[in-house]
Amino acid sequence: MASERLHLILLVFFNHLTFLLSQQEEAGFIYNGFGQAQAGLHLDGAAKILFPDGLLQLTNASTQQMGHAFFKKPFKFDSYEKKLSFSTHFVCALVPKPGADGGHGIAFVVSSSIDFTQADPTQYLGLLNISTNGSPSSQLLAIELDTVESAEFDDIDKNHVGIDIKSLNSVESASASYFSNAKGKNQSIKLLSGDPIQIWVDYEGALLNVTVAPLSIQKPNHPLLSRSINLTDIFPDRKLFFGFSAATGTLVSYQYILGWSFSRSRMLLQSLDFSKLPQIPHPKAKQEQTSPLLIVLLMLLVLIMLAVLGGIYLYRRKKYAEVREVWEKEYSPHRFSYKSLYKATNRFDKDGRLGKGGFGEVYRGNLPHVGDIAVKRVCHDAKQGMKQFVAEVVTMGSLKHRNLVPLLGYCRRKGELLLVSEYMSNGSLDQYLFHREKPALSWSQRLVILKDIASALSYLHTGANQVVLHRDIKASNVMLDSEFNGRLGDFGMARFEDYGDSVPVTAAVGTMGYMAPELTTMGTSTRTDVYAFGVLMLEVTCGRRPLDPKIPSEKRHLIKWVCDCWRRDSIVDAIDTRLGGQYSVEETVMVLKLGLICTNIVAESRPTMEQVIQYINQNLPLPNFSPGSLGIGVSTPVLLESVFNSRSSLAPSISPPSSHNSMFVTHTITYGDGR
């Protein structure tokens, strides 16, 4: 009886031991590469093991493929196990085909069957088809690594990880990333990079966790996805197959599994040995033979590009083209490049235009290391002789006087000259005399300006190496600096004379109202400048233009009108009403009378500029004369011939004028409308 009982106990013990051993065999497995694993795996479709490395390839970058690799034996979970549990760790790689977008991805699969003959590739990942997707009879759980955004499955992007239950519409998904334990935040990871990626899938206590990381990173502390799932509801018979599925469509890639570890228990899961994992092949782009047509098209494209670039070069060359001759080398320090002036004036922008006169337009600009400038574009008459023209421009730039607008240099291109001068911040005098939007100048300011211009003219006539005739003195050519000092500018018709030279003049130049009567017969001289300065004195004191056709005829000619006022013993009536009576009567009357002396139609009766300075500074008394004196108050040359041979004893006697034919220098700085 005792022996029978002992025999029964031993039988039960050996049966239980056999059961435990079989359970341990089914508890898990590990593949560090798949070189010896073919007998334990079920492969179908495009799936195969690449020898000798033992790399498991699911697809080979061909279109419309699917491949499956499952552990052959199902794992049975007995009914006494209240909850299913498992853990797996695998390393995969999705390698793009050179020159193609990859697709569609890899899925780790838990299924009640390994028969996927009815499944479709492409977005169905070789797991389902349009009929079975979402069907209650589909006993399937998949962790998808999806590299294509499928709108029909509401994919979030083309680089995401998702949990799929009976359908490719993920119940949980997130863009591929991993939690960095070092940085304490998620870091993105690209699935279709060709690099090995680690995936952990842990299911325990009805909680499914999916964790992702690059090969070089240990398992992160936090999973990417976490979802409560009851697998018993999905797999009521509790018999489960574990494996992988991958698919391509028109989008293709190489999809590999490098190593795989599986266990029923997370605590018993074996670690993969990365040193034993196979290498990932990276295909090189095929060097396709270039067709002759493509070569011709490329050559044609190159020729077109060269033509376009050549056109741009020629356009820019023409745009910035300048005329340079050998003789100009000696003047190079005074020459500016057209490109620098083009940029300085913001391409001669109209908003920067300061004025427009008879000789050209003036623009404001700014040059580095120079500052604010005024640039006048002058159309040059080639008949005048360019070499002499440039020489006189440069010589004009050498004139140094505090009451001259400094000429900084020039630029020459084709029939155009650009003259560069210092910018005068307060513009021209005529704006303050005739434009009501400008404030009226006080008498003291006007007198200072007249003295400044007289000083500048005296310098031009006697202070330079050569006599310089300005030939266009008027209010619009008198510039005002920041302190309202007068500066004589616009040498648009200026010319040089050697002392004692005498050459006939062939044409009269100047501005109507400022031109001396003898210009038509005797040409220019220093006395023609004195005449114009006399008109300027009347203009500044009266606040009127020398000729104004809009007013009654008896007041139309400024010189005659001032003389008429004097003749009526009311010369103060000619004074600018904008002064509001705030002026010295003695000074204003002196300036008006001096203006009449300077505008005497008998040139020899006009004072020199040196004498004008003495008079205007009241260092000398004015000559004794009256409105009826010969040549006084005559604004037209009608009486010129009858009085020219006479001599006025009431005005200083001046030596005979000389007139010369010289290059006229077109240097104009006009800030108002030229007249």
Curated annotation (Swiss-Prot):
Active site: D472
Family designation: In the C-terminal section; belongs to the protein kinase superfamily. Ser/Thr protein kinase family.
A single GO molecular function term of this UniProt record: carbohydrate binding
Gene Ontology CC terms, in alphabetical order: plasma membrane; plasmodesma
Gene designation: LECRK111
The EC number(s) this enzyme carries: 2.7.11.1
Ranges per topology, Extracellular: 23-292
Protein name stated in the entry: Putative L-type lectin-domain containing receptor kinase I.11
